[in-house]
């Protein structure tokens, strides 16, 4: 039987001793019932936990509204990530964002790869500057904007198309030049870093690069990103 890889985003108690698991895969979101998964001694318990990557098999159900996860193998339980309370809370918020966004994304494969990259990078933190781990969720939030169809413009001034544009306008949806900037825009040296995090390919956003990013830039870029989500998606992060 062919196994499907996915990451469990959310679980809900179902009937007396079962769960509904909401799982992100490269093909989208699956809602599956896992029988006897509330029983600590059940073989189904380990592979039906939130924030767990699993390989699993599905059986179509004729009686229930949900298909059934009949077997599973834990690929990664992200133990290192779960040990730290602050990190876990950070990821919990990220999981909620991905869960709310997934039905509005067309490229599920890219979303899955992005989420998988983020969890793996944080769980196996290889950064010398450990505090910079906060940049990984920021990378996901920035790249998710593109997948949701509201990505900011970094290719020249959003107003006049000039190439020399180093400020960011939330109102205009991208970078602006010195001639088009307003008092409401962000003129900061960190816009270039924001562009790298947004446009950079995942295989290029390696620990060596993340180590070099000034920690002070995080607060500025996160503020811009959060306000951007609120304006264009009505999502308050």
Where in this protein do the model-derived segments appear?
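Non-catalytic alpha-helical scaffolds and adjoining flexible linkers that form interface surfaces
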Residues: 1-19, 24-237
């Amino acid at each position: 039987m062919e196994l499907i890889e996915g990451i469990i985003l959310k679980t809900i108690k179902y009937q007396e001793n079962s769960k509904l698991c909401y799982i992100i895969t490269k093909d989208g979101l699956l809602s599956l019932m896992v029988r006897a998964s509330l029983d600590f001694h059940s073989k189904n318990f380990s592979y039906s936990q939130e924030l767990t990557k699993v390989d699993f098999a599905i059986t179509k159900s004729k009686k229930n509204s949900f298909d059934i996860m009949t077997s599973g193998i834990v690929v990664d339980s992200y133990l290192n990530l779960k040990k730290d309370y602050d990190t876990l809370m950070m990821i919990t918020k990220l999981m909620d964002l991905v869960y709310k966004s997934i039905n509005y994304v067309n490229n599920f494969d890219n979303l899955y790869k992005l989420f998988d990259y983020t969890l793996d990078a944080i769980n196996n933190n290889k950064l010398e500057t450990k505090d910079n781990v906060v940049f990984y969720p920021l990378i996901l939030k920035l790249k998710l904007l593109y997948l949701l169809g509201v990505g900011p413009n970094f290719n020249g001034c959003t107003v006049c198309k000039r190439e020399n544009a180093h400020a960011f306008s939330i109102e205009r949806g991208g970078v602006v030049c010195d001639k088009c900037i307003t008092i409401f825009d962000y003129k900061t040296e960190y816009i270039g870093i924001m562009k790298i995090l947004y446009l950079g390919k995942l295989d290029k956003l390696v620990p060596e690069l993340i180590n070099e990013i000034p920690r002070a830039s995080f607060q500025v870029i996160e503020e811009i990103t959060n306000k951007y989500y609120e304006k264009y998606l009505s999502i308050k992060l």
